[in-house]
């Protein structure tokens, strides 16, 4: 999706059927240093269509060499793992009936916090 200006980018979270409807959704953070918005899109009828947005989340900081977080399934369906916009918390977000809901899963300390969350371990 177009985000407007040069030198702006998207930080992928992953692509999987997030809501159990059989269609694959694509999740990413729109401009992780500026907009800090989780966006979910679905490929439908030959085009990408927006599904849901949720502000206040991010997965990359200026100077980092990788993108943190990802998608996990701890037995109750896929969850997108990101950080809160201020990097204080690790967040798990689900897609249900076209709506995103997020919950705090623990304190963000460093990159190992993402690894722990993705491994379904408590923080």
Specify the residue positions occupied by each region the protein language model found.
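Beta-propeller-forming repeat regions
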Residues: 1-123
